[in-house]
Regions:
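Charged, glycine-rich active-site and insertion segments that engage polyanionic ligands
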Residues: 1-48, 56, 64-68, 145-147, ...
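Conserved alpha-helical scaffold flanking the Walker A/P-loop in AAA+ ATPase domains
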Residues: 15-19, 95-119, 127, 135-138
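Short loop/turn elements that form and flank the Walker-type P-loop nucleotide-binding site
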Residues: 23-24, 71-76, 113-116, 143-146
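AAA+/P-loop NTPase substrate/partner-engagement loops
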Residues: 58-88
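Flexible beta-alpha connector loops of hexameric P-loop NTPases
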Residues: 88-97, 125, 169
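Conserved catalytic/switch belt of AAA+ P-loop NTPases
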Residues: 109, 134-151
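Structural motif
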Residues: 119-121, 150
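Conserved D-loop-proximal element of ABC-family nucleotide-binding domains
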Residues: 129-131, 161
Length: 341
């Protein structure tokens, strides 16, 4: 069942048993990092729940009157709650607001129209504002008949404990790199590139596919080259000399590229630590193994640990919309200092 979704065998088995059960929980929580396949499996599970001919298997193609895919998420018994467009800021909101939960609550008073049950998926449930979370809690306290609610969350620590106590949690773990690599190759990505992407994506098939598709300034191998060049320059020059004039420090460059660069610095520093410890089989950037071995000899293990903390702080600052140029320059100066101590 759902063979096209790689990994997550136990989660798929649980959901198959759920479909066959006479009594079942009304609310599920799919938790785990972004890109692991939570949304994909939730949509497939929703199809099976909405199919009026299913026998504890996938929804059949004959009666499926909907196509729960991006761009076409319409079905009278299906509700999707996700980040909405903010006209004032001209971008997607980064939270679920109370009006969305109020609208969901109103819909739960309705019985199924054409399916045996009604299904709601709440994406990024961990981003509900406090008022929305409290309103959602009331919905769980008096669960609507004929409904199955599926929460998707990357950080369960941001969910109310009282919400956590009223859902059944399915934890999604990173997928084996070998499985990610096989999936990438099946999508016509060259083996050498697939091997690297499978590892630097850290078991996230969604991230691996996004990295594989990225072009131009967001090409992962081009960005990695820039990140590696910065680390190589540490013994020879002040990092500010390296950063000066770099095109990716320009304000016109998307923050997305800066975030990718910082993530690649994290992975390269992690690999340098693995080389320092002679754990070569744990290297992510396997195609750079010789260069990493050579560079690692110039690093103290304690300095690498500190550098990883500094890079994480830079990433958090960028996510919080702190100035990109200032953040990267501060990070570079701190890393240079600990490297040369």
């Amino acid at each position: 069942m759902w063979e096209h979704i790689i990994g997550h065998t136990e989660q798929k088995k649980f959901l198959q048993n759920y479909l066959q059960a006479k009594e079942r929980p009304h609310a599920l929580l799919f938790s785990g990092a972004a890109g692991l396949g939570k949304r994909t499996l939730a949509l497939e599970f929703a199809k099976a729940l909405l199919c009026f001919q299913h026998n504890g298997t996938d929804g059949c193609e004959a009666c499926r009157l909907m196509n729960l895919q991006d761009g076409n998420l319409s079905h009278p018994d299906f509700v999707l709650v996700q980040h909405e467009w903010d006209d004032k800021k001209d971008r997607l909101r980064d939270t679920i607001i109370i009006d969305q939960i109020r609208e969901l609550t109103a819909k739960t008073a309705l019985a199924p129209v054409m399916s045996p049950t009604r299904v709601c998926i709440v994406e990024d449930a961990d981003t509900m504002v406090p008022a929305a979370a409290n309103a959602f809690l009331k919905l769980l306290e008096e669960p609507p008949a004929g409904w199955v609610i599926i929460l998707l969350a990357a950080n369960v620590n941001r969910l109310l404990p009282t919400i956590m106590s009223r859902v059944v949690q399915l934890r999604f773990q990173a997928i084996e790199p070998q499985l990610v690599e096989q999936e990438l190759q099946a999508r016509q990505i060259e083996p050498a590139k697939a091997a690297v992407l499978a590892r630097i994506s850290e078991g996230s098939i969604g991230l691996a596919l996004n990295l594989a598709a990225a072009k131009g300034q967001l090409d992962v191998f081009e960005c990695r080259k820039q990140a590696a060049t910065f680390l190589e320059a540490l013994p020879l020059a002040m990092p500010m000399n390296y950063l000066a004039g770099r095109s990716w420090l320009d304000k016109k460059v998307q923050r997305e590229q800066a975030l990718l660069l910082v993530q690649l610095w994290q992975l390269l520093l992690r690999d340098l630590m693995m080389c320092n410890l002679q754990l070569y089989d744990r290297i992510y950037n396997i195609d750079l193994l010789d260069e990493l071995k050579s560079q690692s000899s110039g690093w103290q293990l304690s300095a690498l640990k500190q550098a990883l903390v500094i890079v994480q702080e830079a990433y958090d600052a960028l996510v919080s919309s702190v100035g990109m140029k200032t953040t990267l320059e501060t990070m570079a100066l701190k890393i240079d200092k600990i490297y040369k101590e």
